[in-house]
């Protein structure tokens, strides 16, 4: 799958005048490409509002990041649960009308989550870095910044807002981008959760190496359909190489019941990322307890 990129504001300089020029790419071919194009525009705006030098100053004042991967490996329950703070999604619209991220995060912590995932995309998921800041102030669990990360600037934003880990999606990044962003994340103390959906993406990640935490997204980001067989197929196909790299696997999306957790755990997933199933619960804490109960 190829996700096209394009400059957010294509312009040409003629003498002392600057002219905007129209894009030649037409319309985005799927929702993921639409998100990426919008994200490029958001990044350009964010760079102007908060220059990197200011973000670096904020990050320098922070205590060390928490050990996200360590929390998953040492979880008292199996599989470990990364519980997601998410108000909406492109496929489902608003998932929770009474969205109180602080109350939800505290309920997750009380219910047995090992780590939390916080959506920071505003346009498509109604999240934000302000939500991440609020959750960081409310709980002591390791936090994942869940976004469509394309630029080092976003990694600095994530760390400055209190994230301990960041998501990198293989489908929207080149190998060069993945390697570079991994290095930037390491300098910030951020754990990288690299996400794949198919065999080609898994092959790329294992060939690059250096990604001990791999997420298998059961959701096709071009159609937003889910299938737990995705985790089963990829873990079986790449079992030997995953074992050789001591990769810790997270199964993401489409997980609604304990039977689903058992299914992906049998395939080799050491953790699951669960959002919608919990966000739709009247009692989020009890919903999580019921989900992880053996």
From Swiss-Prot:
Under the heading Gene3D superfamilies, the entry gives: Aldolase class I
List, alphabetically, the InterPro entries matched. Aldolase_TIM (IPR013785), Indole-3-glycerol_P_synth (IPR045186), Indole-3-glycerol_P_synth_dom (IPR013798), Indole-3-GlycerolPSynthase_CS (IPR001468), RibuloseP-bd_barrel (IPR011060)
Report the enzyme's class at the first EC level: lyase
The EC number on file is: 4.1.1.48
Write down the superkingdom of origin: Bacteria
> Sorted alphabetically, which keywords does the UniProt record give?
Amino-acid biosynthesis, Aromatic amino acid biosynthesis, Decarboxylase, Lyase, Tryptophan biosynthesis
Q: Which Pfam families match?
A: IGPS
Q: Which CDD domains match?
A: IGPS (cd00331)
Which biological process annotations from GO are given for this protein? L-tryptophan biosynthetic process
Q: Which reaction does it catalyse?
A: 1-(2-carboxyphenylamino)-1-deoxy-D-ribulose 5-phosphate + H(+) = (1S,2R)-1-C-(indol-3-yl)glycerol 3-phosphate + CO2 + H2O
- Report TM segments: none
Pathway this chain belongs to: Amino-acid biosynthesis; L-tryptophan biosynthesis; L-tryptophan from chorismate: step 4/5
State the Gene Ontology terms under molecular function.
indole-3-glycerol-phosphate synthase activity; phosphoribosylanthranilate isomerase activity
The family note in this entry says: Belongs to the TrpC family.
Q: Which NCBIfam families match?
A: PRK00278.1-4, PRK00278.2-4
Task: Report what the protein is called.
Answer: Indole-3-glycerol phosphate synthase
């Amino acid at each position: 799958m190829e996700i096209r990129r394009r400059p957010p504001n294509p312009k040409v300089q003629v003498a002392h005048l600057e002219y905007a020029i129209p894009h030649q790419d037409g319309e985005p071919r799927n929702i993921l490409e639409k998100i990426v194009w919008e994200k490029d525009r958001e990044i350009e705006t964010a760079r102007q509002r908060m220059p990197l030098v200011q973000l670096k100053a904020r990050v320098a004042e922070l205590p060390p990041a928490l050990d996200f991967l360590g929390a998953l490996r040492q979880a008292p329950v199996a599989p470990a649960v990364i519980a997601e703070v998410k108000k909406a999604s492109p496929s489902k619209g608003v998932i929770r009308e009474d969205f109180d991220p602080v109350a939800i995060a505290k309920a997750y912590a009380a219910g047995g989550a090992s780590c939390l995932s916080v959506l920071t995309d505003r346009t498509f998921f109604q999240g934000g870095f302000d939500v991440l800041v609020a959750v960081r102030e409310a709980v002591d669990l390791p936090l994942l910044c869940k976004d469509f990360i394309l630029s080092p600037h976003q990694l600095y934003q994530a760390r400055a807002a209190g994230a301990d880990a960041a998501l990198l999606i293989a489908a929207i990044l080149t190998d060069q981008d993945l390697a570079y962003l991994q290095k930037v994340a390491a300098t910030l103390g951020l754990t990288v959760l690299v996400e794949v959906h198919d065999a080609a993406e898994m092959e790329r990640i294992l060939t690059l190496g250096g990604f001990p935490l791999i997420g298998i997204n059961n959701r096709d980001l071009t159609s937003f359909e889910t299938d737990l067989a995705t985790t089963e197929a990829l873990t079986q196909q790449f079992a030997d190489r995953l074992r050789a790299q001591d990769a810790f696997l997270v199964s993401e999306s489409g997980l609604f019941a304990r039977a689903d957790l058992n299914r992906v755990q049998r395939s080799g997933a050491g953790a699951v990322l669960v959002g919608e199933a919990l966000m739709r619960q009247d009692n989020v804490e009890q919903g999580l307890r019921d989900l992880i109960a053996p």
